Amino acid sequence: MGHRVALFVPCYVDQLYPQVARATLELLERHGLDVEFPPAQTCCGQPMANAGCERDALATARTFVRAFAGYDFVVSPSGSCVYHVRHHYDLLEQTDDVRRVRGAVYELCQFLVDVLNVDDPGIAFPHRVGVHVGCHAQRGLRLAESSELGETSGGVMRRLLERVRGIELVELDRFDECCGFGGVFSVTEAAVSARMGLDRVQDHVRHGADVITSGDMSCLMHLEGIIRRQHLPVRVLHVAEILNGTEA
């Protein structure tokens, strides 16, 4: 490719779901990239900013920029974190490095489709799969269409999954509904968050999904907790795990 590519691993993925980070790295390497992992990287600052501590998050944002300033592309398995870097670093002085990093950061599926032009993932996954696109990816990054705008196409993640051999993508009643997580929202409005999550899971189960997949592990973490408590017959997998052939 001839460009420097870095992997940005969200803090919750690093601590709770390292297999998603490994799958993302292996997937990018399968497509011929020499991917670097800057050891100085840390949280993008989204949790603090979402809690109302936006100015307190500036030091974290500056650290993020320093870690990734030398790269042409910064790829992450999280639409939510990518959205934060692209759209919520406005309080930083807009230096060349800040502007460069904000423009270089990509959600994984968007990078595969829009930059690498991946058409055939080259793997099989013979399961019934429900697709969940997180709100920041869907309505923030515009990586999938929204029903309130009369749009029905599935976006970049669904486009990739449709080319996976043996997969059956289930049609949901509410294909673009929020899972209810919302970071701090799941703490401050726990009952509402849990109800929204249960509705989301039940939509997938009702249509026979064996697996719920998403580009955001934060959404899947929320749904997985509900699935376990309710003993529901479905599991969650990050889209990187499917596209990498990690799970079959």
Q: PLM ranges: what are they?
A:
Residues 1-248:
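Iron-sulfur cluster-binding electron-transfer modules in prokaryotic oxidoreductases
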